[in-house]
UniProtKB/Swiss-Prot annotation:
Name of the protein described by the UniProt record: Cell death protein 3
Species the sequence originates in: Caenorhabditis remanei (Caenorhabditis vulgaris)
Name of the gene encoding the protein in the UniProt record: ced-3
Job of this protein: Acts as a cysteine protease in controlling programmed cell death (apoptosis) by proteolytically activating or inactivating a wide range of substrates. Component of the egl-1, ced-9, ced-4 and ced-3 apoptotic signaling cascade required for the initiation of programmed cell death in cells fated to die during embryonic and postembryonic development. During oogenesis, required for germline apoptosis downstream of ced-9 and ced-4 but independently of egl-1.
Oligomer status and interactors: The active form is probably a heterodimer of the p17 subunit with either the p15 or p13 subunit which are all derived from the precursor by autocatalysis. Interacts with octameric ced-4 (two ced-3 zymogens per one ced-4 octamer); the interaction causes the autoproteolytic cleavage and activation of ced-3. Processed ced-3 also interacts with ced-4 octamer to form a stable holoenzyme. Interacts (via large subunit p17) with csp-3; the interaction prevents ced-3 autoactivation and delays ced-4-induced ced-3 processing.
One GO cellular component term: nuclear membrane
Length: 508
């Protein structure tokens, strides 16, 4: 069985290997050394992308024991992967040969019974190996390990589920039985996607109104050495500036004729805290008219102090292709995107610009479709009737229709280097909880805080899609209603947030 410190080293550097490993070359060597067999090779080669192949190789090595770790290190050195070999060097030792009986193979239960300690006549003792490897670590690697240890020691606290959490999720056996509601219960969204209970976080109450606010201790950080090892300018956007960039949040809550967007304050507080932790300077604007939204975004785009990236978050009512101001005047979303192009935002030319839109895009409601939950299926979060509201003008059966023939901004083509994350698909409503905020923003904060350290933004938003689609639902009469976010990406490279704790990283 592979030592835990070695498993951890491979796990936390999985992003490095997935970007720089030559899978075909390494796979041949590992098969020749009898670390992997032909069946393993078939599984790896069946992966859809090169990056998935690289990850599968690392996972296969993890499953094959300590001898596989050392053979993997030797293979990296022999094939010219010197940078990757340096990652493993502190815990590695070279070997001259291996035999199948030295491997741990989870596909063959008998191999577990045959596993044994390495013969002293062949290798030095495990204690000696560990001591020698530590003494050979360079000062750079030692500092990196210190930083990582400190980061882990200050990670978020965990707590078990309490009775007050029960209305937030249901088991597969009673997935359509609503539970009593309590505005004072804590949201534990990670349980809905099957995350380990040790990763479950609690959301603090910021006021008597039970706003569940994201805090800095909820963020998983990455350290500077990892960032610079991973970065590839040909395939990744730069995102190293201090601050990372500017973030504008437009939060429309009170409208002239449309209903108040209860719960949007929780969205604003959560998303602003999230991006502050990621290194952005956040500016919030509340209750803007249609014209004021355009002028504010125009000024934001022309700002002279932009960093390596920019973020725009819009929390409002909406319809398909439009955002509605507090004066009930609608603004075409494509006009907003046009303000962010290179001509109107020269400081942001060739830089990633991320737009998050929490608003309805129509009046349709997604009734979902029945699926049979397996034993480890994803439980859904049941919202009591009357708590979840839509962000569309025709919500609640035309009870708050705005006047027609309002001004609509012209549509213009959007440009490259822009990513738009919509809370819902075109023509459908999006849902918002009056205490916890919208489903979409809750999921963004949960997923980004956990995985922004090693996932690019497209991967992150795919996880958000999964969390909203599988982890939330509400009821309207006898109908169970669902929501599906949508991602539109015009990025030309991968974009990583790489949230960096400046206090700990300064020691590197």
């Amino acid at each position: 069985m592979m030592r835990q410190d070695r498993r951890n080293l491979l796990e936390r550097n999985i992003l490095v290997f997935s970007n720089k490993l030559q899978s075909e070359q390494i796979l041949e060597v590992l098969i020749a050394k009898q670390i992997l067999n032909a069946d393993n090779g078939d599984v790896i080669n069946s992966c859809r992308t090169e990056r998935d192949k690289r990850k599968e190789i690392v996972k296969a090595v993890q499953r094959r024991g300590d001898v596989a770790f050392d053979a993997f290190y030797d293979a990296l050195r022999d094939t010219g992967h010197h940078e990757l070999a340096a990652v493993l060097e502190p815990l590695a030792r070279t070997i001259d040969f291996i035999t199948p009986r030295d491997l741990e193979c989870p596909m063959s239960p008998a191999s577990h019974r045959r596993s044994r300690a390495l013969s002293p006549s062949t290798f030095s003792s495990p204690t000696r190996v560990h001591r020698d490897s530590v003494s050979s670590v360079s000062s750079f690697t030692s500092t990196y390990q210190d930083v990582y240890t400190r980061a882990r020691s200050t990670s978020r606290s965990s707590r078990p589920l309490h009775a007050s959490d029960r209305h937030n999720y249901v088991s597969p056996s009673n997935s359509f039985q609503s539970q009593p509601s309590s505005a004072n219960s804590s949201f534990t969204g990670c349980s809905s996607l099957g995350y380990s209970s040790s990763r479950t976080r609690s959301y603090s109450k910021a006021s008597a109104h039970s706003q569940y606010i994201f805090h800095e201790e909820d963020m998983n950080y990455v350290d500077a050495p990892t960032i610079h090892r991973v970065f590839d300018e040909k395939t990744m956007y730069r995102n190293f500036s201090t601050p990372r960039g500017l973030c504008l949040i437009i939060n429309n809550e009170h409208f002239e004729q449309m209903p108040t967007r209860n719960g949007t304050k929780a969205d604003k507080d959560n998303i602003s805290n999230l991006f502050r932790c990621m290194g952005y300077i956040v500016h919030c604007k509340d209750n803007l008219t249609g014209r004021a939204m355009m002028l504010t975004i125009r000024d934001f785009a022309k700002n002279e102090t932009h960093g390596d990236s920019a973020i725009l978050v819009i929390l409002s009512h909406g319809e398909e292709n439009v955002i509605i101001g507090v004066d009930d005047v609608s603004v075409n979303v494509h006009e907003i995107y046009d303000l962010l192009n290179a001509a109107n935002a020269p400081r942001l030319a060739n830089k990633p610009k991320l737009v998050f839109v929490q608003a309805c895009r129509g009046e349709r409601r997604d009734n979902g479709f029945p699926v049979l939950d397996s034993v480890d299926g994803v439980p859904a979060l049941i919202r009591p009737r009357g708590w979840d509201k839509g962000d569309g003008p025709l919500f609640n059966f035309l009870g708050c229709v705005r006047p027609q023939a309002q001004q609509v901004w012209r549509k213009k083509p959007s440009q490259a280097d822009i990513l738009i994350a919509y809370a819902t698909t075109a023509q459908y409503v999006s849902w918002r909880n009056s205490a916890r905020g919208s489903w979409f923003i809750q999921a963004v904060c949960e997923v980004f805080s956990l995985h922004a350290k090693d996932m690019d933004v497209v991967e992150l938003l795919t996880e958000v899609n999964k969390k909203v689609a599988c982890g939330f639902q509400t009821s309207q009469g006898a109908n169970i209603l669902k929501q599906m976010p949508e991602l539109t990406s015009r990025l030309l490279k991968k974009f990583y947030f790489w949230p960096e704790d400046r206090n700990r990283s300064s020691a590197v």
